[in-house]
Amino acid sequence: MVANSSYLDFTSYGTIPASVTDPATAYGLTNTQPVTGNAHITVAVVLNRANDPTALLNADWGTRQATLAQMQANGTLWTTYGADTGTFNTVKTQLGGIGTVLGDETGTGGYVTSAASRTIWVSLDAAGFQTLFGTPLMKGAAFGGAYEQLYWNGDLSLPASIASSTAGLWFDYGMDPATSALTSSTVALPQGAQSPGNQSTSATELYPQDIAALYNFPLSGPAHQTGTLALIEIGIGDALNPTIPGPSFQSRLQAYLATAGVPGSGAYYVQNSANERYNADNADERSLDVGVVSAIVPNSLIGLYVGSGDTVYTAYQTAIWDQQNNPAVISSSWSDGLSFAPGSPFATAYRELFVDAALRGISVFNDAFDGGSGNETGTGLTNLFTGSMSSYAMVVGGTSVSTLAAAQTDSTLAGVVLAAQQGDLATLWQMVRGGLTAWPVGAGQLEPFIETVWNQYVLSGSRLFPGYGENFATSGGVDTTQATPGYQTAFGLTPTDADPSHGVGRGAPDVSALSQGNMGYLLPGSNMLGVYPNGGTSAATPFWAALATEFNAIFKDQGLPNLGYSNDLYYIAAAIAPASFNDITAGNNVSTFIPGSTYTSPQLGGISATGLGYAAGQGYDLTTGLGSPNGLLLARALSSIAHAELYYDLTPVLENAGAPSSGASAGWSSTADQSLLFQSSLSHAGEWSLSLGSATYSFAGNAASPYAWTSALAQQSLQSDFSPTLVTLFDGYGQGQIVQTGVAAGTPLALSVSGTPATSHQAALTADYGFVDFVSGDGLSSVEVARPLAVATTANGANDADAVVRLRQNGVNDVSVMFYKVADYAGTVDGLAPGQAGYAEAAAAHAYSTISGQTTVSGSGYGAYSQTELAHVNAGDLIAMKLTSNGETYWAFASGNETVNGQHVAHLWSYGLNTWGWEDLYGGGDHDYNDLIVQLDFTSASGSHLLV
């Protein structure tokens, strides 16, 4: 027997009681009997890999990409990770004697059969099914005889000669899960909107490229050549309504682009067009996808993948294995809605598809879906389409974006609008973290005011409209059928579902973007005629895929490989460059229900709500993931990380030789003789302590102001269009305590807050980039350990490179900064340590010049932004700074600065990836450490300067 291979393991894991094992009972089938005659069912037999690629795919991105490129070049990639060729041929011959083998390595007919894909598709009649699986193929009348449903009883078996080589099975048979109530606990819903920020009476409607501009996408599509992008368009392709005559699909696409004001050819192709048929619902999805990507990356070749027309699986497979067009990015807004069991051959087959995509160097973006936490599935518990939740794909959730004009006509945002207009700091602080770059703004300006979770459900009396059975809220939650991916664990996450079982697994979504609500996309209609507002995570997903296509174009320009499987890079970016994402903190996706009589909902009839789901909050959450993109800042972060991983063996600021996997403070040690900053950010005044070797130092720490600058704000401020008003609005709010000292290589290090050891859950992501955060048990206080200097990770490991310098002044003094090369992490120059006689002269002799020949860079005035470039930077240079403020000199190393109460004063605060803030007043001033924000960027000036 093949374990976990029952029909309900294929379709209905977790959606019916475990005690229900009979498919006919689960689905309410009648007139059940064995299949006779000419009925066929098609199945993929997925063979074992010759070798397990898990270790390679768990390696860092740089190692992964370099290894895959080498294996591809020497022809060993698929002999290593495909099926054994001899085994493949033997099993194929055996299956050909039982049924009809379909497809080939090119995907003929919508089926890929090849040793590399490890897949053999075979069409079976009833006798062939019995021969291969040892059980009859059954049929029954479903929904009162509306259609005939195929199924089987019990587990499947395979001939021993095939079973030993088989890892997975997949039936090309579209089916929804059987469902029944799995809880009886219900709740009363509040009247009105179920989530804020989706009820404007003057919603904004924009073309996709204009929405991309709101998210600060790095490229202007028409000006750049971008790569091939695949859209999963099961069964529809470029089919048009045959009853409505008109121009070709190509002509209609070009007409849409012309209407949108986008120059571009609208080039596309269809894979397996013989399997496409016009269906209005499928066509609407297709036209949405095509409209989004063609308007944003109009120079990309767009592939429409039809597959067999029966399951999304086949469309994925043909896109992944298209070795002629080789799409670098796949976007899917489709899901095979069934719920397969973990450990089943069906789960293995589906999940290995995305492993193939990762090995092929393809980035996959899947939608979270549009059914809220319940996913339009009436079990009363939270649900996801587990087939789309692969840890090798980026799962995309949905938001609603409100301009000020839209917010002013949304009753759920009245309090936010009023607070912002009254200058409430807490409100503006949170909105800035959500992406606000200018304030105040005019009511007519197309600036995002606030972004919230997409959830348009409204209760009026006992009627939900829109309701839980309609596509009006982002799905999101936890796929407990698989383990938490390493990149989420490294980010400090333990995704836990809202069900009474509180299962742990893969959190979804990873990221989010506009779906609908208070803003919509202007897109072609289902028949590619006219322009209409549309949206959903079905729009947010190709939106992200278009952004990734821009990233690939930038990577190519900089000499990097395509992103490929790169989920880990996005999580690293969020940890070291948090301004890469807009943090959505308002809204929820609650939509769980069971059949009942409390409320009525379109598509569902009578329901009762069970109230399980997820709310947005600070940082990662299960409605919006890491957040929505700041495209340019994310591109810069990804570029920096990619070059660092490909070309450098970085020395982490600390290493952990023996700490538990929880990230506990014990076991950490210094990796070098180095000067380190210890920055406390306490939620309330209290003690924190630092242990270095056998010595422990305790500090009576002051609480940081609620508006003390964060890494996110510091990095956000380094955008040329970030409002000086917002910069100066948050001036003068003090940080906590800072201590700077030299630490010898190998010195053990531990930190405690209020007597309790602090833990570092993101050290694996940040230590290579010069800092580690140690967080208190309640998560409200932290101490960051950071270096006060930059390591020049230049693009491609090149010497004599230019480095971008970005400055934002938030102090009133005249300030300038000098950048100079030091010999080591302790800051020595020519054998002199900071503070020693002659150090200033030695530092000046090693100063970098700007491209205009200056050895200092001046601030541009209170609140102002400025930018320049350093010349002649070599790979691996260690770069430190000296600040001059009103005639006083301050060094990045406290030992070179003035002494107050017997202690040298630290004037520098770390704000993440190569970003620091200076305190420009003698003695430490107001301790806000934002008088001059400085960032060094070693990769954006490479190639064609696309990110400068």
Predicted regions and their residues:
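Extracellular distal adhesion/interaction modules in secreted or cell-surface proteins
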Residues: 646-930, 937-947
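Short beta-strand-to-coil "C-cap" segments at the C-terminal boundary of structured domains/repeats
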Residues: 636-641, 935-942
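Secreted peptidase-domain scaffold signal
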Residues: 210, 524-528, 606, 611-615, ...
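An often Trp-containing, charged/polar helix-loop segment at the C-terminal end
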Residues: 552-618, 622
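Substrate-binding/charge-relay-adjacent region of secreted/lumenal peptidase catalytic domains
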Residues: 2-113, 121, 126-395, 451, ...
